[in-house]
Amino acid sequence: MASVIIDDTTLRDGEQSAGVAFNADEKIAIRRALAELGVPELEIGIPSMGEEEREVMRAIAGLGLSSRLLAWCRLCDFDLSAARSTGVTMVDLSLPISDLMLRHKLNRDRDWALGEVARLVSEARMAGLEVCLGCEDASRADQDFIVRVGAVAQAARPPPAFADTVGVMEPFGMLDRFRFLRQRLDVELEVHAHDDFGLATANTLAAVMGGATHINTTVNGLGERAANAALEECVLALKNLHGIDTGIDTRGIPAISALVERASGRQWPGRRAWLAPVFTHEAGIHVDGLLKHRRNYEGLNPDELGRSHSLVLGKHSGAHMVRNSYRELGIELADWQSQALLGRIRAFSTRTKRSPQAAELEDFYRQLCEQGTAELAAGGMA
């Protein structure tokens, strides 16, 4: 099985989400959880933010857990100097690489960028640090210029990171870009995707198909602006759709997802597989097929996430599922009872917008029996 390296940036780009601020204990807890999950590389902060940030980064580095740790730095002397005191072994030196950003953000040009890449990559290596060269706004940059930047830095062999900073790539274009870079650069390549058009995960997968060896992710897709490629989606899709191993223990995904949700104060759409709805079935046709053979309606094995299929009753259930559910409660139904209870269940779900619980199902059955008894009594009196 082929492999891809996860470089998770929950503790850096994830925390850059508007309104998200992890405290030290939360950062350490997330760091421990990522290590338990088997994530090999982590961006743990921005040392130029100040001594408080650097102190937390040192505490994280001092845990002595597995995973290589990166500090995110602008491509400048101050940031590189600040990173040296944090205990990390690797720096992500980030440089705007599009003409638009070079001109309107830094008031610089391509020649300046090439010179700074050569100088600061060399300085970082001499300081004993490994380097990832972050190419900010690579999706809007001239691709030949990205190759020139990669060639300048190639002696130090930092993996260039292709950042779709404003999320304007689509999968076919991303595939072509990485094939282009792979043909011209004999280095590892990393992708950093944003979700402006809901394509961060798809673009990340396309980059891997084009030759990316490293991928940036965040837990739950947490991240600045439109967020990032979700660790969970990327790991599960690479494994199940492409047979690519990331070394991640997927059974730990629900727990770390919940941890980051609490720490960030951000809740995530119920559609996401690791939060269980993908394994919850109501529609009669689906339930019938699942009971006959689980793979009839199983694209993702819930065992990978420590989950199991859940069959619930609702508006779209059939009489067979009603009988099966009541059998689990120790109640055997006649056909007419199944049909009568199905009507009650559908009315309940329409009114309450949820599935009935076991106690409510028992109430429905009791009411049905009482109704039948009353009707029999009324008939006898007549």
Swiss-Prot record:
Keyword presence, Phosphoprotein: no
Keyword line: Nitrogen fixation, Transferase
Example GO BP: nitrogen fixation
Keyword check for Nucleotide-binding: no
Any Pfam family hit: HCS_D2
GO MF terms held by the record: homocitrate synthase activity
Pyruvate carboxyltransferase domain residues: 4-254
Residues spanning the signal sequence: none
UniProt similarity note: Belongs to the alpha-IPM synthase/homocitrate synthase family.
Known role: This protein is a Fe-Mo-cofactor biosynthetic component.
Name listed for the protein in its UniProt record: Homocitrate synthase
Upper taxonomic lineage: Bacteria, Pseudomonadati, Pseudomonadota, Gammaproteobacteria, Pseudomonadales
